[in-house]
């Protein structure tokens, strides 16, 4: 049954194609643009380069943009809002809650910073703020207020609870989970939705298991899942995607290149999940390259299009550093891929 549902979806994709986002009443473009690189993720990005990148995304027909207070410690929301407020056409905006951008002041001291993630290179263009995790009722409401100011819009389409889960928080997960569930974080999001301040909410995370848990606590409309439904990681297809469909929760998929290995040439960068790729992943990727070569399909194109073959997925997000990369991603996204290619991947056990 799942195969039939997948094969009914036409694979001649357009980046500008509008898709219904679950029950939110929103339509998003099949290809969305994430803004983390604009905050100086891994390397500095000038204002001129950031503006050019956003304009290239708009010019490519993209009308769904994702940001977060964390990205550049507020910088990305400023940049995105400045661009979108000048456009005659409304785009869909998602941002996130769970982190507040703040500093010490008279009458307020900040808690100690959590242990630094060794994989986190920091923000080369970040604003001069510190991030403080706060998933409580007041924290969510303040985060929404702050994002309104940075983006310059009185309403925000979607709010994702950012990085809740053990992958980010480790031993402190229960503390933050209790703030979200018992401390009113989900209640705040529900109130914002009921008042029309947002159209929907969900989680923005790197682990599908925490979205599954959250569905037991709140009525999620849409969630952003990074790196956990791809050509190299499909555990969620059986364990989670059917639940999302049953609960009427739309999905946006990010991290389709799994930290770069699926966009790199054969023998190039071999990073998977922010670390050196294990041997079994390299073997699987090389076999994907073999089949892609046989059908004259760029592996990056297959990686981008694969998640959208499942009807639970409404859109994918890309994060790029230049207008040229946006244009290349659009070419990959719109590449014609024959059904025989996907059938070959299935026969080899590379997709289900």
Where are these regions (language model features)?
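Short, well-ordered coil/turn segments that N-cap beta-strands
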Residues: 26-31, 61-63, 88-91, 153-157, ...
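N-terminal binding-site loop/beta-alpha segment at the start of enzyme catalytic domains
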Residues: 2-114
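Short, acidic/polar
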Residues: 44-57, 136-150, 206-213
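Beta/alpha (TIM)-barrel catalytic core signal, keyed to glycine-rich beta->alpha loops juxtaposed to Asp/Glu
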Residues: 13-15, 49, 83, 145, ...
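Short amphipathic alpha-helices and their capping/turn segments at secondary-structure boundaries
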Residues: 14-24, 77-92, 140-155, 238-250
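Charged, glycine/proline-rich intrinsically disordered loops and linkers
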Residues: 104-131
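Structural preference for long, well-ordered alpha-helical segments within the folded cores
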Residues: 56, 64, 146, 150, ...
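Short, solvent-exposed loop/helix junctions and linker helices
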Residues: 133-137, 234
């Amino acid at each position: 049954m799942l195969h039939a549902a997948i094969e009914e979806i036409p694979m001649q994709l357009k980046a500008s194609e509008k898709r219904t986002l679950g029950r939110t009443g929103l339509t998003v473009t099949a290809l969305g643009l994430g803004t983390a690189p604009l905050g100086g993720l891994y390397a500095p990005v000038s204002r001129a380069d950031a503006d050019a990148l956003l304009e290239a995304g708009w010019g490519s027909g993209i009308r769904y943009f994702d940001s977060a207070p964390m990205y550049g410690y507020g910088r990305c929301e400023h940049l995105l809002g400045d661009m979108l407020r000048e456009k005659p056409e409304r785009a869909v905006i998602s941002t996130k809650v769970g982190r507040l951008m703040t500093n010490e002041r008279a009458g307020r001291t900040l808690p100690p910073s959590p242990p630094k993630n060794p994989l986190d290179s920091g923000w080369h263009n970040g604003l001069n703020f510190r991030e403080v995790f706060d998933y409580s009722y007041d924290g969510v409401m303040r985060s929404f207020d702050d994002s309104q100011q940075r983006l310059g819009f009185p309403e925000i389409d979607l709010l994702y609870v950012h990085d809740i889960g053990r992958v980010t928080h480790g031993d402190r997960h229960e503390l933050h989970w209790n703030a979200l569930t018992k401390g009113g974080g989900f209640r705040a999001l529900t109130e914002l939705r009921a008042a029309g301040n947002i159209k929907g909410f969900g989680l923005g995370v790197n682990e599908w298991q925490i979205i599954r848990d959250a569905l037991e606590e709140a009525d999620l409309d849409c969630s952003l899942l990074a790196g956990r439904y791809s050509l190299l990681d499909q555990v969620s297809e059986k364990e989670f995607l059917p639940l999302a469909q049953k609960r009427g929760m739309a999905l946006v998929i990010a991290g389709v290149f799994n930290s770069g290995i699926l966009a790199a040439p054969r023998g190039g960068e071999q990073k998977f999940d922010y670390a050196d790729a294990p041997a079994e992943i390299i073997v699987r990727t090389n076999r994907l390259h073999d089949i892609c070569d046989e059908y004259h399909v760029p592996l990056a194109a297959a990686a981008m299009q694969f998640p959208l073959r499942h009807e639970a997925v409404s859109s994918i997000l890309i994060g790029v550093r230049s207008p040229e990369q946006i244009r290349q991603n659009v070419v990959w996204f719109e590449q014609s891929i024959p059904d025989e290619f996907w059938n070959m991947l299935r026969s080899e056990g590379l997709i289900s």
